[in-house]
UniProtKB/Swiss-Prot annotation:
InterPro entries reported for this sequence: Cyt_c_oxase-like_su1_dom, Cyt_c_oxase-like_su1_sf, Cyt_C_Oxase_1, Cyt_c_Oxase_su1_BS, Cyt_c_oxase_su1_dom, Cyt_c_oxidase_su1_bac
Amino acids binding Mg(2+): 371-372
Binding site for O2: 248
Protein name stated in the entry: Cytochrome c oxidase subunit 1
Organism, scientific name: Cyanidium caldarium
């Protein structure tokens, strides 16, 4: 067997598996972004543009876009890619706790992706949205195998995530550096740890919900079928008990990356380290107690709505602690506006905008009007499309030199930031106005009155795609004729222990040798 196949297909090395995850995430992200551009072109003007009036096909695109970005781009990139690459390096571990489990965690993802893509080509595809609500996902409304394939895809992806999460928990608790207690590990490791616990506790609930849906579709049960004594709202409760923590699974590792980046480029330790840790844990706990704010329109009684409104508004407190801690870290720091820092600042500004619209839709009275309008789309894309994505870009530009030993072009990186920043704002900010005007989501046509802001939004999507193409060009240039990266490219003074070197990965070579720590290094306070 060739050494290449041995290395990449049977790898047990956390760096190689991290690289595979990053490549997989980039591929899935391109697919998801292409689908979103197709949807925006369809919505650029009233009437039929590219989908010849096929509303089912439009909903298949919505479903594929959501699932691709959430399960196949963001989680594999942030947890699988950056998590695998840097958690062992930062905590001084020789590898992950279970290297072969790590391998199967990755190799479950491509079959899962294939099943999801296959579902779009079976009969009319799965036009349910990523939420898979019955009765739309029931056998009466989607009679073919498409929804079943999507369910199997989510099962396999969920198994992968659960295995990966248990691996991270075992690694961080058991093969951490002897000198690093839990209050000394960097915030990126903390964010991965908290995220792993969320995955471990919520993915099994999703698995249960979609398994029951599978039996409803194929084995004549009626858990979600009201004609047989079931309740479709039960699915919504089960799904959102997973689905709301899921959005924190997506954004918490990005929080960790932003904490590291802001600290490095402000030349200061992060402000309120312990406060940020407790904010992370609070978000994790509160995030599992607010799921029904996605369901204000199903006819809950007023006491239930009052509780879920109050609990949802309460999440703003730990989130605010994190945002103000990042701002305080930058306050009076010696700020260096390199590309990762630009993405971090962009993240803080735009995530705050998304958080503010979140405060609006958390109010049950208002949400009755705003539910399933473009206002909600604008809200969660500001948090996810801008939050998680900017976190990924910040992490990539921050660590690319460590991953491949080559540095990117700073000029092109900054141009990429500005194109992306302008593009995503042009895309999603007008959606607030459309939502307030009452345009519903998941519908490919609309009255003429809404055309103006839709044109602006589609223009923004095209700008964002140009930014994405530029990003891949930046990566191509870095790999082909990039500058050789030093062990710590962000150091002001050419010393090993500059103020920016607060984590272990900057003390080793770029790229690191295949087996970085043959024996666990000892870290001591000086």
């Amino acid at each position: 067997m060739s050494r290449w196949i041995q290395r990449w297909f049977f790898s047990t090395n956390h760096k190689d598996i991290g690289t595979l995850y990053l490549i997989f995430g980039a591929f899935s992200g391109l697919l998801g972004a292409s689908i979103s551009l197709l949807m925006r072109i369809e919505l650029s003007h009233p009437g039929n543009q590219v989908l010849i009036g096929n509303h089912q096909l439009y909903n298949v695109l919505v479903t594929a876009h959501g699932l691709l970005i959430l399960f196949f781009m963001v989680i594999p990139t942030l947890m699988g890619g950056f998590g695998n690459w840097f958690v062992p390096l930062i905590i001084g571990a020789p590898d992950m706790a279970f290297p072969r489990l790590n391998n199967i965690s990755f190799w479950l993802m491509p079959p899962s992706l294939i099943l999801l893509l296959a579902s779009a080509f079976v009969e009319t595809g799965a036009g349910t949205g990523w939420t898979l609500y019955p009765p739309l996902s029931s056998v009466q409304a989607h009679s073919g195998g498409a929804v079943d394939l999507a369910i199997f895809s989510l099962h396999i992806s969920g198994i992968s995530s659960i295995l990966g999460a248990s691996n991270f928990i075992a690694t961080i608790f058991n093969i951490r550096n002897p000198g690093q207690n839990l209050y000394r590990i960097p915030l990126f490791v903390w964010s991965v740890l908290v995220t792993a616990f969320i995955i471990l506790l919520t993915f099994p609930v999703l698995a249960g919900a979609i398994t029951i849906l599978l039996t409803d579709r194929n084995f004549n049960t009626s858990f979600f079928d009201s004609s047989g004594g079931g309740d479709p709202v039960l699915f919504q409760h089960l799904f959102w008990f997973f689905g709301h923590p899921e959005v924190y699974i997506l954004v918490l590792p990005a929080f960790g990356i932003i904490s590291q980046v802001v600290s490095t480029f402000s030349r200061k330790p992060v402000f309120g380290y312990v406060g940020i840790i407790y904010a992370l844990i609070s978000i994790r706990i509160l995030g599992s107690m607010v799921w029904a704010h996605h369901m204000f329109t199903i006819g809950m009684d007023v006491d239930t709505r009052a509780y879920f409104t109050a609990a949802s508004l309460l999440i703003a407190v730990p989130t605010g602690i994190k945002v103000f801690s990042w701002i305080a870290t930058m306050w009076k720091g010696s700020i260096s506006l390199k590309t990762p820092m630009l993405f971090a600042i962009g993240f803080i500004i735009l995530f705050t905008v998304g958080g503010l619209t979140g405060l609006v839709v958390a109010n049950s009275g208002l949400d009755i009007s705003l539910h399933d309008t473009y206002y909600v789309v604008a809200h969660f894309h500001y948090v996810l499309s801008i939050g998680a994505l900017f976190g990924i870009f910040a992490g990539f530009y921050y660590w690319i030199g460590k991953i491949c030993g080559k540095q990117y072009s700073e000029t092109l990186g900054q141009i990429h930031f500005w194109i992306t920043f302008i593009g995503v704002n042009l895309t999603f900010f007008p959606m607030h106005f459309l939502g307030l005007a009452g345009i519903p989501r998941r519908i490919p046509d609309y009255p003429d009155a809404y055309e103006g802001w839709n044109i602006v939004s589609t223009y923004g999507a095209k700008v964002s795609i140009i930014g994405t193409i530029l990003f891949f060009y930046v990566v191509y240039l870095a790999f082909t004729n990039g500058l050789i990266s030093e062990p710590n490219p962000w150091s002001l003074r050419r010393e090993r222990l500059d103020s920016s070197s607060r984590t272990t990965e900057w003390l080793i070579a770029s790229p690191p040798i295949y087996h970085t720590f043959n024996e666990i290094p000892v870290i001591k306070e000086t």
